From Swiss-Prot:
Residues 93-112, 130-171, 309-419, 433-460 are annotated as: Disordered. GO terms for molecular function: DNA-binding transcription factor activity, RNA polymerase II-specific; DNA-binding transcription repressor activity, RNA polymerase II-specific; RNA polymerase II cis-regulatory region sequence-specific DNA binding; RNA polymerase II transcription regulatory region sequence-specific DNA binding; sequence-specific DNA binding. Keywords: Developmental protein, DNA-binding, Homeobox, Nucleus, Phosphoprotein, Repressor, Segmentation polarity protein, Transcription, Transcription regulation. The keyword Phosphoprotein applies. InterPro entries: Engrailed_Homeobox_TFs, HD, HD_engrailed, HD_metazoa, Homeobox-engrailed_C-terminal, Homeobox-engrailed_CS, Homeobox_CS, Homeodomain-like_sf. This is Segmentation polarity homeobox protein engrailed. SUPFAM superfamilies: Homeodomain-like. Residues 454-513 bind DNA. Belongs to the engrailed homeobox family. The gene is en.
Length: 552
């Protein structure tokens, strides 16, 4: 049984199979020998070509001639090629034994080959050019999918040489010695050959260093040209913006918007007259500083007052060099108040040569306006006249409309055309920053119909309660919530009654002593705080008069 199993036809190797294996093994050995012979032949050709190129000086540096580094690299490459050729010859001589070619992997060496030029192997055009590298050619033979898709043109391909057409085995990927040893990667580009296909993949090792354009120096002429272009672009943008603004202002026809049209016309007339009188440097400065603010501000003010009754417009007197005054109150320092004050100027001001300096300083502070006007027309009277006391201005100025303020501020200027300081309430944001709030009138209080039964009776504190409240007030004038609750529970009073008693006590002491908040004193001196519940002392009157300019 054991003999049958040992000699069974399934387990015994057939002589045909042994012959086939032997033939296959011989074919593999022959293919490997042919491949190694081809490599040796290629190395010999490359060595000869490299020696010819070294003699002709082909491998030149892009920036300079053939230097010592390139020569050393080429010599090392040639020596390596000689050593590799000798090693291949020894390997071929010993490859006849069956042990040397037992496996295909051990018999296929990783060759390091030199770079070829177009004259030897010109079958592939790398990146649509006629030069190629030997490593790409080897890689294309090794991998079927690694096909250069850029080489689709028929003229770009040449038939491969004979020693490559008969090679059926695929050698391993090889690296170029000259690529590794030289300072540039890739084949030598032909001079004067530009990249034909710009849409393909950019491979930086193709571009030669000599073809890279050196950046030109950024000269002063270029800088001036660049700044001139920037200025021209800015001027064009400014002109477009001014044109758009002019179109916006011109869209208000006098039939539909008579008051807005009148405001725009008045502002343009005043600005043109001021520009005609001001000398050229001042006019250019004013045109830069105040281009369209007055017109746009008067437009906003007029739009906010469309529903209000129109004020009687004052006819402009003829232009004279002796007497005129800028009757509009000066705007505050912030730009938001320009919209209201410039509209006041358009209806009650008359432009002339005498007020040109004041009109040009419309957006300045009162002190700068005084300096400008005093240096011009008012040179004869350098000291401005003091403003009237706050009593001359209405006590209830908060109830006035914007039209009333125009007439009142116009009356503060004297007939000599001397520009005065405006009262402090003009600068208050309540009246100059919100022109759309309209006229303010005091509403009369309606009498209440409450009878004596509905009125809450006056709290009558007992002597003990009063004594306890006074003692607490002397300790602390302001009660905390917890202390107020304790007093309410102890005295049998409401918390509101205790709170009101403390408030009244503080008010009586404040009224009797006459001490005031310094902020209230300053506002009273400027006419902004007219709640004179306590008569002013001599010091306060003196302070107020000094603030108003009545006392030097």
């Amino acid at each position: 049984m054991a003999l049958e199993d040992r000699c069974s036809p399934q387990s015994a190797p057939s002589p045909i199979t042994l012959q086939m294996q032997h033939l296959h093994h011989q074919q593999q050995q022959q293919q490997q020998q042919q491949q190694q012979m081809q490599h040796l032949h290629q190395l010999q050709q490359l060595q000869q070509l490299h020696q010819q190129q070294l003699a002709a000086g082909v491998f030149h540096h892009p920036a300079m001639a053939f230097d010592a580094a390139a020569a050393a690299a080429a010599a090392a490459a040639a020596a390596a090629a000689h050593a590799h050729a000798a090693a291949l010859q020894q390997r071929l001589s010993g490859s006849g034994s069956p042990a040397s070619c037992s496996t295909p992997a051990s018999s296929t060496p990783l060759t390091i080959k030199e770079e070829e030029s177009d004259s030897v192997i010109g079958d592939m055009s790398f990146h649509n050019q006629t030069h190629t590298t030997n490593e790409e050619e080897e890689a294309e033979e090794d991998d079927d999918i690694d096909v250069d898709v850029d080489d689709t043109s028929a003229g770009g391909r040449l038939p491969p040489p004979a020693h490559q057409q008969q090679s059926t085995a695929k050698p391993s990927l090889a690296f170029s010695i000259s690529n590794i040893l030289s300072d540039r990667f890739g084949d030598v580009q032909k001079p004067g050959k530009s990249m034909e296909n710009q849409a393909s993949i950019f491979r930086p090792f193709e571009a030669s260093r000599s073809q890279t354009a050196t950046p030109s120096a950024f000269t002063r002429v270029d800088l001036l040209e660049f700044s001139r272009q920037q200025q021209a672009a800015a001027a064009a943008a400014t002109a477009a913006m001014m044109l758009e603004r002019a179109n916006f202002l011109n869209c208000f026809n006098p039939a539909a918007y008579p008051r807005i049209h009148e405001e725009i016309v008045q502002s343009r007339l005043r600005r043109s007259a001021a520009n005609a009188v001001i000398p050229p440097p001042m006019s250019s400065k004013m045109s830069d500083a105040n281009p369209e603010k007055s017109a746009l501000g008067s437009l906003c003010k007029a739009v906010s007052q469309i529903g209000q009754p129109a004020a009687p417009t004052m006819t402009q007197p003829p232009l004279s060099s002796s007497a005129s005054s800028l009757a509009s109150p000066p705007p505050a320092s912030n730009a938001s108040t320009i919209s209201s004050t410039s509209s006041v100027a358009t209806s009650s001001s008359s432009s002339s040569s005498g007020c040109s300096s004041a009109a040009s300083s419309l957006n300045s502070s009162p002190s700068s306006r005084l300096g400008a006007s005093g240096s011009g027309v008012n040179a004869s009277s350098p000291q401005p006249q003091p403003i009237p006391p706050p009593s001359a201005v209405s006590r209830d100025s908060g109830m006035e409309s914007s039209d009333d303020t125009r007439s009142e501020t116009g009356s503060t200027t004297t007939e000599g055309g001397k520009n005065e300081m405006w009262p402090a309430w003009v600068y208050c944001t309540r009246y100059s920053d919100r022109p759309s709030s309209g006229p303010r009138y005091r509403r009369p209080k309606q009498p209440k119909d409450k009878t004596n039964d509905e009125k809450r009776p006056r709290t009558a504190f007992s002597s003990e309660q009063l004594a306890r409240l006074k003692r607490e007030f002397n300790e602390n004038r302001y009660l905390t919530e917890r202390r107020r609750q304790q007093l309410s529970s102890e005295l049998g009073l409401n918390e509101a009654q205790i709170k009101i008693w403390f408030q009244n006590k503080r008010a009586k002491i404040k009224k009797s002593t006459g001490s005031k908040n310094p902020l209230a004193l300053q506002l009273m001196a400027q006419g902004l705080y007219n709640h004179t519940t306590v008569p002013l002392t001599k010091e306060e009157e003196e302070l107020e008069m000094r603030m108003n300019g009545q006392i030097p």
